[in-house]
Amino acid sequence: MSLFLSFFISILLCFFNGATTTQFDFSTLAISNLKLLGDARLSNGIVGLTRDLSVPNSGAGKVLYSNPIRFRQPGTHFPTSFSSFFSFSITNVNPSSIGGGLAFVISPDANSIGIAGGSLGLTGPNGSGSKFVAVEFDTLMDVDFKDINSNHVGFDVNGVVSSVSGDLGTVNIDLKSGNTINSWIEYDGLTRVFNVSVSYSNLKPKVPILSFPLDLDRYVNDFMFVGFSGSTQGSTEIHSIEWWSFSSSFGSSLGSGSGSPPPRANLMNPKANSVKSPPPLASQPSSSAIPISSNTQLKTSSSSSCHSRFCKENPGTIAGVVTAGAFFLALFAGALFWVYSKKFKRVERSDSFASEIIKAPKEFSYKELKAGTKNFNESRIIGHGAFGVVYRGILPETGDIVAVKRCSHSSQDKKNEFLSELSIIGSLRHRNLVRLQGWCHEKGEILLVYDLMPNGSLDKALFESRFTLPWDHRKKILLGVASALAYLHRECENQVIHRDVKSSNIMLDESFNAKLGDFGLARQIEHDKSPEATVAAGTMGYLAPEYLLTGRASEKTDVFSYGAVVLEVVSGRRPIEKDLNVQRHNVGVNPNLVEWVWGLYKEGKVSAAADSRLEGKFDEGEMWRVLVVGLACSHPDPAFRPTMRSVVQMLIGEADVPVVPKSRPTMSFSTSHLLLSLQDTLSDCNTVALNSSRSSSWSVPEHNVIIRSDDDHLV
């Protein structure tokens, strides 16, 4: 008990010294907590700093936390320690036009924004504007600003000429990749050291990319605003802040874990921050010099001696503090006991289930999801996933519109498949993956809650919409799915094999950005480990032939499925065309899409595979490139298929497309007793036929192939 009392007294003494602690974090950035300037906007919990346009433009946007934060103690000007973790992405709609970047910024000004272009929205014309401290992530090498290259991080004070810079290529980070990038920015007010770390992983690197001494109190006022600024410079870059946390305190170092994301999950709803109605911003002079550490030694004993004098001169006050501390601790313990007893009495839950999903984002109550879906009314059904029905729901507390997937299977095996979706996607974060908001396990039900995608699934946009999906949207969708798969295969902690990439599992947001969903069949594999044989499952037309025969899913099986999606999106035809009398296709056309496109490629007219509904409104060079990439991904031999990272590079023009043979190769899979050709596996659009007439001691059992209908739709 004495330990708690000592801690409580030390906290109260911090208040006597006028110290202020600030802490906040967001999963869905609430508009009430943010101040948006310029082109900045909030959509689906993501802050966009610049405009989402397909034509080159110049603009700037800024987002700030709405309350000023104390950065110096009153009187002493002692600097705060702070830590900020955030996830961001920089995507280029048109890879040929690059220029701009974003910055984490600390500024006394919450009402103005700098100019577009290379200034990142930080400064006005000719470098004018308010004072600031910033960490920039720059995608353009500007000699006027002494940039080291077009892929760097830099530390700026009152201008965009960085005093310290780091090449992100040295840590294998590509700002323009479109992938989610995590950054940790930390300042220790005791040691006066400023650190910047960057990674694709949720784990903070052991060695920061920037680390240098800094007297922060020379460059900040007592109160400052924190946030982000971004700009474009005649480009189509989109700068997005996907998640953000911030914490600060006086008189102590923030631990190494400060500002890090919660374990393998997206974050919860915004927490109430501890900022206490600070006084108006003081107008303090700020040096414009580039930060160079002084040799000023920090007298850490001064605060403790101050505490000692206070204790000697005010014994009555200290006694009162101790008494009050004991009372409030007892009150706090009683409140905790009451809250937890109510929680445990509320509903029975499976302990084993809770341990499996400890990494998931948020737990919803069955009551609120039932109310949000009108008692799971049939009128709210918007699709069917691999293992459940998907409902449109409205969360009663927030009014957010969500998609609720309800497990429709009672067997434990099916529930385990359903749970795999939760355990996998809950640990992932990428702008082209459907975001899992939370879960519920009550009354024998398993429910998953996702962001609702207003434009539905890709297959509905292709085949059921009254409007033709334009070529620019199709290109963006294919690039988004490729980026998501590249992330799953090589850029997250454990490799994730999706195993069910198809158009009905690709969702479209309000801007027709692709979001890959349905991880019910996905499997996690440690990098560089061989996959184990499992039951082959998926949808005919998207399944790689070697996966059908061996049951071993690898990243190349996902590549094959992606190739089928590419050809489907470009041609407007399903991988296996069941209706040969569709008006826009001639009667007698090969029902197998890959074979049909490969035949056109052999004849030198592969662009004829383009969807006739596009009416020729596309660039033929782009069309040819995308179709050849689709054929390369559809190669019967997995060894000749590209990786998804190389596919991304091909689509944006950073790499040449591979040489694809004019005739479709005939790949055979054999053991000492079996030779089974590709045609044997894909000749039937509804079944998988194994030629039993061949003499063999080895076979693929019929129950090892699960074919799913193209009518499966999910979120």
Curated annotation (Swiss-Prot):
It catalyses: L-seryl-[protein] + ATP = O-phospho-L-seryl-[protein] + ADP + H(+); L-threonyl-[protein] + ATP = O-phospho-L-threonyl-[protein] + ADP + H(+). One of its GO terms (molecular function) is ATP binding. The active site is at D500 (proton acceptor). Residues 255-296 are annotated as: Disordered. ATP binds at I382, G383, H384, G385, A386, F387, G388, V389, V390, K405. It is an enzyme of class 2 (transferase). Residues 376-676 form the Protein kinase domain. Its EC number is 2.7.11.1. Residues 22-247 are annotated as: Legume-lectin like. GO terms for cellular component: plasma membrane. Keywords: ATP-binding, Cell membrane, Glycoprotein, Kinase, Lectin, Membrane, Nucleotide-binding, Receptor, Serine/threonine-protein kinase, Signal, Transferase, Transmembrane, Transmembrane helix. Glycans are attached at N126, N195. It is a single-pass type I membrane protein. Gene3D superfamilies: 2.60.120.200, Phosphorylase Kinase, domain 1, Transferase(Phosphotransferase) domain 1. It comes from the Eukaryota. SMART domains: S_TKc (SM00220). Residues 283-296 have a biased composition (Low complexity). CDD domains: lectin_legume_LecRK_Arcelin_ConA, STKc_IRAK. Residues 339-715 are cytoplasmic. Residues 22-317 are extracellular. Pfam families: Lectin_legB, Pkinase. It is found in: Cell membrane. In the C-terminal section; belongs to the protein kinase superfamily. Ser/Thr protein kinase family. In the N-terminal section; belongs to the leguminous lectin family. This is L-type lectin-domain containing receptor kinase VIII.1. The lineage of its organism: Eukaryota, Viridiplantae, Streptophyta, Embryophyta, Tracheophyta. The gene is LECRK81.
